């Protein structure tokens, strides 16, 4: 029977170092308080006794070599083996990431501790100095509280960089839309409402009209044929009817003072150009995201009906490598999609279910809840039915389906198989599964073709490519890529 520890938050890697050492005195803890120019370092043993007082180390290659040299000297002096040494500091920012990575490349174990937890370990809560912060970090490391296996590495790290960059560009795009609304409300009130102008807001026909000589008076005076030609070249359907509706509406709105029109038009033209640039950058990032997603286990999330590339990439990037990730129960708490529970008064005491915790990975939570909403609208039949049942029962359906989706997704990524309906998971015939694969294959292929990443996704060296080869061999079918 597996022994369970009451210290569930302790790092397995750090616990193994303590177990291998003869005594905790033969463990060297290198606590680091990162900074942009000079880090503060302190050596102590596993019992908490300081072996070397805090000293500074430059955030340079020379600083890395100097620190390693000092560690070797302390190991020789205190007769501590190299494999019983580990480094640790608060989850570092971008300016210290290369420093920690250099230590890992030299073969050292580098742990990261949560800054908020480290703050609670300090002796003095009122003040904050490098030395006080260092003591809190050292206590966290001695208590084996640290993350030694970053899940976001390699392809997962590259994917997370792209996902978070795209997320910020989407925020900028929303901000730009709001600014354009403010300008349009003065030049041509109501133009961005489809029921008024007949044009869907911020699509190409709408942008073409806004980027040059745009005001209610100018749209009203413009020749009908010129406006029809402009809308037709922009790809608008039924341009004649839309041009007529637009000019009729322009004759019935309030117009701005003439002395302000030129300035507002210049501002709007710049906004349209910036908006186009942001949209082009987002499209480029999505194509790159699809290529990196295809090289990870997260590609299997795309096989769930209702889940597209953006949602699959977002969840995969924040979870990281499923092989090194914690159990699903920990991930659910990490994502902030499980309510807090309070119970007291013995076995007969009542249980209070509160709201979800605010301390979580908000980005992962956002992508999971969005995925749950999509599954409730467009997902597999069993998931849509479950979403409706939870909603009818007064539960938070999106949170419930998000937890179920996370369990399903982790199982798919760890076992390298696509999503199967409930009736095909157990006691299903070979013919039933063969038919399911042949029916769903065109839809799966179209998802990847949308981003031009289908050849990468189904390459023999990538997870979906290996799954495709296995299915073709076992079920004697052909799943064509072209």
Where are each of the predicted segments found?
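Gly/Thr-rich phosphate-binding beta-strand-loop-beta motif of the actin/hexokinase/Hsp70
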Residues: 18-45, 137
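Short alpha-helix plus adjacent loop in nuclease-associated cores
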Residues: 55, 104, 111-149, 207, ...
């Amino acid at each position: 029977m597996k022994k369970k520890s009451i210290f569930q938050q302790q790092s397995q890697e750090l616990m193994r170092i303590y177990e291998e050492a003869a005594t905790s005195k033969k463990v060297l803890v290198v606590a680091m308080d990162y900074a942009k120019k000079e880090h503060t370092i302190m050596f102590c043993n596993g019992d908490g006794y300081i072996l070397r007082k805090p000293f500074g180390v430059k955030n340079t290659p020379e600083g890395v070599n100097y620190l390693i040299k000092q560690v070797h000297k302390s190991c020789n002096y205190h007769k501590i083996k190299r494999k019983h040494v580990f480094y640790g500091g608060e989850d570092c920012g971008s300016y210290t990431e290369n420093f920690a990575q250099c230590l890992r490349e030299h073969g050292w174990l580098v742990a990261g501790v949560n800054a908020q937890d480290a703050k609670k370990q300090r002796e003095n809560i009122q003040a904050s100095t490098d030395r006080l912060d260092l003591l809190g970090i050292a206590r966290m490391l001695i208590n084996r509280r640290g993350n030694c296996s970053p899940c976001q590495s390699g392809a997962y790290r590259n994917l997370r960089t792209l996902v978070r960059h795209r997320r910020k560009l989407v925020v900028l795009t929303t901000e730009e839309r709001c600014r354009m609304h403010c300008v349009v409300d003065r030049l041509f009130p109501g133009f961005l409402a489809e029921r008024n102008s007949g044009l869907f807001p911020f699509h190409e026909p709408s942008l073409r009209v806004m980027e040059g000589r745009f005001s209610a008076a100018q749209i009203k005076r413009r020749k009908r044929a010129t406006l029809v030609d402009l809308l037709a070249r922009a790809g608008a359907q039924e341009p004649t009817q839309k041009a007529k509706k637009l000019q009729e509406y322009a004759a019935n709105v309030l117009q701005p003072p003439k002395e302000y029109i030129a300035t507002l038009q210049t501002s709007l033209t710049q906004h349209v150009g910036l908006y186009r640039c942001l949209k082009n950058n987002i499209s480029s990032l999505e194509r790159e995201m699809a290529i990196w997603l295809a090289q990870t286990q997260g590609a299997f999330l795309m096989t769930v009906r209702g889940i597209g590339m953006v949602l699959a990439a977002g969840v995969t990037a924040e979870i990281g490598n499923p092989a090194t990730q914690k159990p699903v129960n920990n991930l659910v708490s990490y994502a902030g999609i499980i309510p807090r529970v309070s119970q007291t008064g013995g076995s007969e005491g009542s249980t209070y279910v509160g709201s979800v915790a605010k301390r979580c990975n908000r980005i992962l939570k956002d992508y999971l809840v969005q995925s749950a909403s999509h599954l409730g609208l467009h997902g597999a039949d069993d998931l849509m039915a479950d979403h409706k049942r939870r909603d009818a029962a007064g539960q938070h359906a999106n949170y419930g389906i998000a937890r179920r989706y996370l369990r399903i997704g982790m199982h798919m990524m760890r076992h390298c198989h696509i999503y199967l309906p409930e009736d095909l998971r157990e006691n299903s015939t070979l013919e039933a599964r063969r038919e399911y694969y042949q029916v769903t294959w065109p839809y799966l292929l179209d998802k990847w073709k949308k981003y031009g990443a289908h050849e990468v996704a189904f390459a023999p060296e990538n997870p979906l490519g290996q799954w495709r080869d296995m299915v073709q061999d076992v079920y004697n079918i052909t799943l064509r890529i072209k």
